């Protein structure tokens, strides 16, 4: 079964709320295919603040689990308060997440598609107009 990879995007945004609300509406079949690139601890703390309960599982690889939990491929992130991550850590997290997503998406045998949640473009260091241009540059 091919996987769908979702990049959580900006840690200071409403993306975790969108992810949770969308997750609840998915069928069990689709939930088995989805892997989220994010920071496991950040997501758990954001869900707690928002009052959301979801089964979250930390995985190292997209073939590691095949259940209906929200499977998180962890990307390191230093933070003290969820939704208030400093700009330097946010930029590094976003770029690391995009790079991991790109790497996984190149494996066409295992990955059906890649979805990225919104990011503030300033975290791309004004070198790219957006995520599409960032990925296009990586494919040159």
Each model region followed by its residue ranges:
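Contiguous, glycine/small-aliphatic-enriched amphipathic segments in soluble metabolic enzymes
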Residues: 1-139
